[in-house]
Amino acid sequence: MTTPRRTQQQRRDQAETALLNAAAELVIEEGVHSLTLARVGERAGYSRGLATHYFGSRQALLQRLAHATQSGFVPGLDGAPPGLSRLLRLIDGYIGALGQLRMPNRAFLLLWAEAATAADLAAIFRERDEAFRSDLRQDIAAGITDGTIRPDATAEDVAVAVLAQLRGIGLQRLVDSPAVDTERLRRSVTGYWHRALALPQP
């Protein structure tokens, strides 16, 4: 029985995934400053020039890596309508994902931390953080509209606070994993935001 030949797009997708995984591994092992297109290509088992062919520049690679490692951080939310329920599921799922701290999650948090002092990352993560806050603001606005969130909740303030809390917990998990009980924390933090935001129902 012959194995079906992969299409050109399938080969391209496989190569890009391998390159992004290699880039994430290098970030985790040696830091973002070690990242070059040539090293990523070699680490992935391809030629030194393949990463350049796919991404064009180191900056474009970092942009793609940031997007790829953030996507799917909390699975199961695609298609969920915005509102209090989605917000609480996001918080619970984010902290739960930190309990496993898989390679993409670890790489994303390390890149995010580096963005404070690395100019080539700062613009990328301003955009990623704003996209995250925008989703959170949508949840707050939808919850106020449907009567599940208090009308005096300020969407911008809540979005900033939730993002800061989740990323802060993530960095603590990176630095001192035993000190962060994610299973207990996911329940307490989700419960806190439910109490802080939910409009009491009659």
Model-derived regions: residue spans:
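C-terminal peripheral helix-coil segments that are non-catalytic and often amphipathic
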Residues: 1-3, 85-96, 133-134, 138-142, ...
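Short loop-to-helix capping motifs
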Residues: 57, 114-119
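Hydrophobic alpha-helical connector segments
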Residues: 64, 75-105, 155-162, 183-186, ...
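Short, basic, alpha-helical segments at the C-terminal edge of helix-turn-helix-like DNA-binding modules
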Residues: 67-72
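Amphipathic alpha-helical packing segments from all-alpha helical-bundle domains
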Residues: 74, 100-103, 119-146, 157-160, ...
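Secondary-structure edge/capping motif, primarily at the C-terminal ends of alpha-helices
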Residues: 112-115, 173-176
